[in-house]
Amino acid sequence: MAKGFTFKQFHVDDGGCGMAVSTDGVLLGAWATLPKQGKLIDIGTGSGLLALMMAQRTAPAPCSIIAIELDDSAADAAAKNFSNSPWSSSLHCVKQDIQQWNRTQPKNNIGNIICNPPYFNFGLQADSQTRATARHTDTLTHDALLQSITHLLAPEGIVSLILPEYEGRQLIQAAEKYGLQCQRLCEVKSTEKKPVSRLLIELTSSTVKSAPQKEALCIHDSGQYSAQFIALTRDFYLKL
């Protein structure tokens, strides 16, 4: 039996990656606004899940998707997953730190960026170095991430992210210092009675200021996946 996770149109082998395929990643990949044209960058691609999801969603009008990954094992896994997918010609994995790669790129040339960033600050580390790198901001602080985004993002460009609620609201505040504003925000709960656990965040470099479009999503309803969750993710999960 193949290792990893099989979706409707592709398979993700996440062995050796710091973070396995997760609901967070699937939510972000299904929710993110599609690029209108040009390149899409996936920062910290891990196993390549987000890049693959965006490749599936943009397949009718393919765009170039560049996935950046610092960890050697994860980058190798992503490259293999890309080559085994139906969209191998559109997917490219770069094994490099985003800040180093950033220095080789022209300013304000990327229309769409997607990222499931690390969110734990210093303190208790994960049970392996690879997992720690994927989950902790020690190797990529949110300020460093925002600096890279500001350099890369084209005028009117869009950035899509997912974070725990507290870290997400902190990042939205920090983004304002870099000329990025939140234009779309989805509060995610596991059930209606639970507190908000995740924020799906869309930032833009647009200079037109307005209140963000607010959305809400409950993953479960009466012990089953909710109609909202099924509608959002049914193009990917095999059993939906």
From Swiss-Prot:
It comes from Photobacterium profundum (strain SS9). Disulfide bonds: none annotated. It comes from the Bacteria. Its EC number is 2.1.1.223. Pfam families: MTS. Belongs to the methyltransferase superfamily. tRNA (adenine-N(6)-)-methyltransferase family. It is found in: Cytoplasm. GO terms for cellular component: cytoplasm. It catalyses: adenosine(37) in tRNA1(Val) + S-adenosyl-L-methionine = N(6)-methyladenosine(37) in tRNA1(Val) + S-adenosyl-L-homocysteine + H(+). Keywords: Cytoplasm, Methyltransferase, S-adenosyl-L-methionine, Transferase, tRNA processing. SUPFAM superfamilies: S-adenosyl-L-methionine-dependent methyltransferases (SSF53335). One of its GO terms (molecular function) is tRNA (adenine-N6)-methyltransferase activity. This is tRNA1(Val) (adenine(37)-N6)-methyltransferase. Specifically methylates the adenine in position 37 of tRNA(1)(Val) (anticodon cmo5UAC). One of its GO terms (biological process) is tRNA processing. PANTHER family: TRNA1(VAL) (ADENINE(37)-N6)-METHYLTRANSFERASE (PTHR47739:SF1). HAMAP family: tRNA_methyltr_YfiC.
